[in-house]
Amino acid sequence: MIEFANERVVSFSLDYQDVFWEVKPTTEDLQQYEFYVQRSEAEAGPWLVIAGPLVDRYYIRDSAVPMITTNARTLFYRIRALHVPSGKETYSATVDREGLPNLMAREMIRRERILFEEFVGTRCWLFPRRSFGQRCPNCYDDVLGKKIDSQCPTCWGTGFSGGYHYPTSFWGQLDSSEETEQVTTEDHRRVQHSQVRAGPTPAIKPLDLLIDFQNRRWRVVQCTGTASLGATIRQEARLALIQRGSIEDKIPLKITNASVRLVPPRN
């Protein structure tokens, strides 16, 4: 099978994004390959095919960007190569406009990953919140232009069918929760906040759902991080604990406890 190289997303316009890719030198007949360009709002999918089949073409222009692009949304791309005679397929790396880090940044990311996976991190899952696509057929009101049921089991209160993209597992350092009692003249309630530090992937943004190794559900309320030459090295996010009984408690997380390591080995 062929191997991809130099995948990149480039654009200096608000009207489109250009996706380029190359193939490493090979003795195979490239005329027997079909390329399909896929786009997603989350690194783990689901993926939408936006171009293909392409034969001996290594560039496309995504002109649907103006309808779905905002400052708070990152679009990810990958290329699927299908060998028509054999039916075998392979995929490129997932890329966005930020691009791939240089060697120094990759080494910093590698050391951070070892730190989180072997010493200070715990297993977490990130559900990226949907922000475009099919509106919820059950709770979205076309006349009012908004969702009318915050406890809808179809969109999980987001207004978009499905609510969240596929979850991504990662290792992150989760701080002890900060507890605050909010007291008013009518009632009072306890609010818990925390902070999580993680590597550059998966990309975390406000309103995403994070589930920790204790099955606590957190809402991302603020994001920041560290970058080198435009490439993200570390992400830091402030979290708010979702109250018990909320609709987010019913979102299923399908894992096998026997095969998942939740915390690093304790020496």
Give the ranges of each region predicted by the language model.
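Short, solvent-exposed secondary-structure boundary/capping segments
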Residues: 183-184, 226-243
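Short beta-strand/loop turn elements enriched in aromatics
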Residues: 125, 157-193
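Beta-strand-rich modules
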Residues: 62-87
